[in-house]
Structure formats: C-alpha cells, structure tokens
Amino acid sequence: MLATSLHHGRREAGCDEAGRGPLAGPVVAAAVLLPEGYNNEALDDSKKLTERQREALRPVVEAVADAWAVATVSAEEIDKRNILHASTHAMCMAVKALLGESVEDVVAGGHMLGRTHPEFLLVDGNRFYNETNLPFQTIVGGDAKYMAIAAASILAKTYRDDAMRHLDAEYPGYGWSRNKGYPTAEHYDAIERLGLTPYHRRSFTLYRQHTLF
C-alpha cells in the first residue's frame, strides 16, 4: 500500500513527469494535491498499470483531488533547456498553477483549486530545480511509494499519451499513437524514410548516432 504522506498534517502535492526518454513530443508533468489521508489501492506507478487502467484512473484522480494541474513543455523548449531542466520546469509550472498563478500551457482543476494550496512537494526522482518557494523532497521511485506522486504520474502519462495521439494525426507515419515518440525500430525507420518533424527533439544524441542530420 502506498503512503498517504511524508509529513502528517502538512499539505503535500505529488509531482511527476512523463516523456523524458522519447525522441519526439513534449515532456508533460503533473502536480496533484489529494485530500489528507486519501487512499486508493488502485493507484500505483503509472508504468505498472495498463493503458486501460491509467485511462480509467485519470477521471478518478481529477474528481477526488483537491487540486491538480498538468503542464506541457515542447520539444523546442526541451532542446533549449535540456531534458532534465525541461522536466523540472514542467513540474514547477504545474505547482505554480496549484498556487494560483496564471501559467501558460497548463490545464488545472479540482474542487478546491484556488482555495487550498500545497505546503510541501513530493517529487519523483533524485534531482529537482525548484522554481517555487515551497520546500520539497525528491524520492527515487516515488510514484511507487506515495499516493500523491502516483496520482501525478497517472495524469502526466495519460495527458502525454493524448498529446502524442494528436501529433500522430498531424504527422502520420511515425507510429506515435503506438510508440508515443520513444526510440523504437518503427520510429527510427520512419525518421529515415520521412525525416524529422518540428516535434522531434534535435538535441538528443540518439539522432547523431544514427547520422540522421
């Protein structure tokens, strides 16, 4: 069973991202503030769930969360910042939305959005460049340890999958509905046949290894 909090009595938002490894598409991050003590045994690290399970849990998270936000950082911005900075920037964008700030490229909701705010951040991973004034704790494998991070991982993953399906319709032939932009043989073959799109991350060294420029 996942833990409901790190510090009892403190409002903690879970933060996670999806899309650090793909060759194409955005990185998407989510921040979720769950009701204190909320527990749902179905919630888990999104990577351990099937696509159907993730899609079923997304509206559950959105409905039960006091507040949630999902932020998107484009491939172009990833190339400018590098993927680590882009990922943590996306998390901070989502957190700022929970704090009531107006942030572009963010969708947010929750029945307490704007009326309650996080006091502490639980961040999946081991590195975080904090752009907020909130204290935080990085937690390796946090999406398999804490309920709020697991909820954030589900939102980040499902929103990014949606984005890749839309991009697949715009640029058919790369199989993005299936591979979600990750470095599969199908994706490499498509790049060699069709070239790069505006949604490809040109900074990723995998391209150079395949002499695609």
Model-assigned labels for residue ranges:
Residues M1-F213:
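RNase H-like, Mg2+-dependent phosphodiesterase core
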